Amino acid sequence: MVLSPADKTNVKAAWGKVGAHAGEYGAEALERMFLSFPTTKTYFPHFDLSHGSAQVKGHGKKVADALTNAVAHVDDMPNALSALSDLHAHKLRVDPVNFKLLSHCLLVTLAAHLPAEFTPAVHASLDKFLASVSTVLTSKYR
């Protein structure tokens, strides 16, 4: 999915508002995903998945850091996320549908925390951005 210049501006502005809360929001999105889509827990059998778990917080920070990297390299996401794509495709073997589920939960989390900034245009831009990230992460499955 191609991001327009307006989409890129919206994504960078919205992610800038996330700022220091990125890890917290990443963990919250993971918790939402685990509660809403319990089958996603199968990829984390070694994690304590309870609310506030240090492992979920740690992985939430990893998710947020990867998204921060994608925002910073929005014009070259395939190269920026190449190692992460390899990891998820070849080692972790995560079903690609799970990226869509996490993206949805992240959008809900951002809407809850940033209601003033989460306009329809920003929502659409973030949705396109997360779809692009998902596409890049699943590109090495083929």
Curated annotation (Swiss-Prot):
Changing N10T: In Broomfield. Changing K17N: In Beijing and. Changing A14P: In Ravenscourt Park; causes alpha-thalassemia. Changing R142C: In Nunobiki; O(2) affinity up. Changing R93Q: In J-Cape Town; O(2) affinity up. GO terms for cellular component: blood microparticle; cytosol; endocytic vesicle lumen; extracellular exosome; extracellular region; extracellular space; haptoglobin-hemoglobin complex; hemoglobin complex. Changing K140T: In Tokoname; O(2) affinity up. Changing E28V: In Spanish town. Changing D7A: In Sawara; O(2) affinity up. Changing G60D: In Adana; unstable; causes alpha-thalassemia. It holds the Pfam family Globin. The modification Phosphoserine is found at S4, S36, S50, S103, S125, S132, S139. Heterotetramer of two alpha chains and two beta chains in adult hemoglobin A (HbA); two alpha chains and two delta chains in adult hemoglobin A2 (HbA2); two alpha chains and two epsilon chains in early embryonic hemoglobin Gower-2; two alpha chains and two gamma chains in fetal hemoglobin F (HbF). Gives blood its red color. This is Hemoglobin subunit alpha. It comes from Homo sapiens (Human).
